[in-house]
Structures are given as C-alpha cells and as structure tokens.
C-alpha cells in the first residue's frame, strides 16, 4: 500500500471550493475493529478469498464523501470513482458551489487527464506529474484501486500492516502515513466485505473517506 493514502489528496484541488459542502460523519458505525496479535487460520483463508474475488472482478465503482485538511485549511465533497480494469474515471464535486473536477487515466500506461481547472484541462503521460503540477500534491493514482479495496500491493515495498480478528487490514503505517480502516460494508451475495470508513493522517494532513455505495460487476 505504498503511499496510497496520498491519492485522496486530490481533494486539495479545491479546498476553498469544497469547504463546508459535504459532511463526513465520524464513527457513525460504532466501535472500530480492534487490532489483534494473532489471526486464526480460518480468518486468513477468508481474507485470502476476499482478495482473490476482488482481483477477479476488475470492474467496480463507489460513491462516497471525502474530507481533507492540511493545517487550518480543509474542505469536503462528494467522490465518484469508476474503475474498469486499468482505466479509471474519478469525479469530485462540491454540491453547494456546483464545482466539479474529473480525473481520467489508465494505471497500465500511467497517463492521465485532469478537467475542471482554471485555464482548461491538463493531460500528460504521467498522471501523478499532471496532478503534482496542478495541485502541488504527490498522488500515486495507479495504486488507488488496490488501496481503496484494502488489497495488498505485492510490489509496494515494506509496510507495517496490523490486522483485525478477521484478517483484514486494520491499520497501515507507511511513508509517514497512518491509515485506519474503521468500518466495513458487510458481505452480500453480490460482493465480499469492502471498506466503508477510512481515516488517515500524516502530520497535520488528514483525510477521511466514507463510502456510501459500492457497485461491483459480476
């Protein structure tokens, strides 16, 4: 999960425009899962099955609310992420100001295009560089699809991952960030468990994501 939490920093595109637009409730789902020192073999197998299922279903989307703060600056908005294999289409909107930004790209090629900025769209062979030049944030968008589903990233380098009793990631510490998976959407006949509420912090930078709805293609 190398650096993935910074992906949500794309909301820094419009902290002023998003300020106060959408609330992201804290802890509305009850107590967060506890970190455990040992995980049962059945839990490990269940988590391995969850990840295998998600890897086999690369077309998915989620809608939710995101809030980001950096020191005294902060804002919130609605986030609509659509993924089809390596291709993604991400829309961030501020309902009150009616502002919106769209990021599209391909995790295979790394290219991306950002729309909704003053001065017109920006595009380039490196989506991360496009976002860096537009916002000042380093955002590894190619890792976001794995991270938001709490999938392990095999080639991401060393990371500390604490698990809950179900074998799922509970807290991840890497590259200065502490990422907490605080609530999960229960499994259904159509999909396995998926993260619902995630909070992260790195110094005075904080990000909160609340997923209202997951949709996965058969």
From Swiss-Prot:
Biological-process GO terms, alphabetical: lipoprotein localization to outer membrane; protein transport
Pfam families: LolB
N-palmitoyl cysteine-type lipidated residues: 21
Keyword entries, A-Z: Cell outer membrane, Chaperone, Lipoprotein, Membrane, Palmitate, Protein transport, Signal, Transport
S-diacylglycerol cysteine lipid modification positions: 21
Description of how the protein assembles with itself and partners: Monomer.
UniProt cross-references to NCBIfam families, sorted A to Z: lolB
Function: Plays a critical role in the incorporation of lipoproteins in the outer membrane after they are released by the LolA protein.
The protein's name in its UniProt record: Outer-membrane lipoprotein LolB
Organism for this UniProt entry: Xanthomonas campestris pv. campestris (strain B100)
Gene that this sequence comes from: lolB
